[in-house]
């Protein structure tokens, strides 16, 4: 893997520049800028309908400095596969506008609605056909662009407009899909979770993903101040707490001889080695209005215990897979 340093990345021009209309404090712009810093040269981006798409391409303006294609909600991976196949054909025939470039990075961005739910069929097929591209999941844990509706990525207990917290039902009643495990089960060569609170880790993982010959998957937690109900200046802080509480652990998974090999990233490895440093789930939930029913009008110990036990179990399983 090519060396990545913060100094070099800071000097590299941004692929996503000013003019975006995303909400104040939106983590998606941070994720995209960090991931795009890791590209090697000519790059083509496909973008599913969602917050990032509608806010960076308001006609007749664009915030993108690279070729960029707006896709439907459900087909961003399919469009990326078509681009990648076209590039291969140009290289094989040694003709066409992209034939002169030895490498053209293809990156697909989509939210959790376009990944967990509406776009999963296309994503699954594109991975199994082994197209060479990097898929970046920008997970803000709901359909934020259309009004904060629950998605397959919405966590247990979260209050949304379609899973409102009330006296009878305390927010979403189901757990979120284990999307990373689902993608790993496809035999995907490289899967990693990323968090903008650790920018160098993001860029190193993005470069690893891009350099792999085949489909790769980056899963970014993208805190949403509007949907999660926290002050916009706390975006990175809330994201950091997600990892420090093991709600969103950081790891990598690569395939070796047909077997998935897990490796915890530094922030999560430190917790595995020193379990007492793991923060309780309340530290994360208390920051967000979507979970205020866990604490008001009275503290709901049963809900907190259920969620804490679920997180602890998933964390223990991940540590076992990583051999720590």
Predicted regions and their residues:
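Short gly/pro/ser/thr-enriched loop/turn and capping motifs at secondary-structure boundaries
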Residues: 53, 140-145, 225-227
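A structural motif
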Residues: 170-188
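Short, conserved beta-strand edge motifs with alternating hydrophobic and charged residues
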Residues: 137, 192-194, 217-221
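Acidic, Ser/Thr-rich peripheral helices and adjacent loops at domain boundaries
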Residues: 152-172, 235-249
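Active-site glycine- and acidic-residue-rich loops that bind
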Residues: 113-117, 195-203
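Cofactor-binding active-site loop characterized by glycine-rich and histidine/acidic residues
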Residues: 3-135, 148-158, 172, 185
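Glycine/aspartate-rich loop-and-adjacent alpha/beta segment that forms the canonical ThDP
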Residues: 202-324
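Ligand/cofactor pocket segment of small-molecule handling proteins
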Residues: 167-171, 188, 193, 206
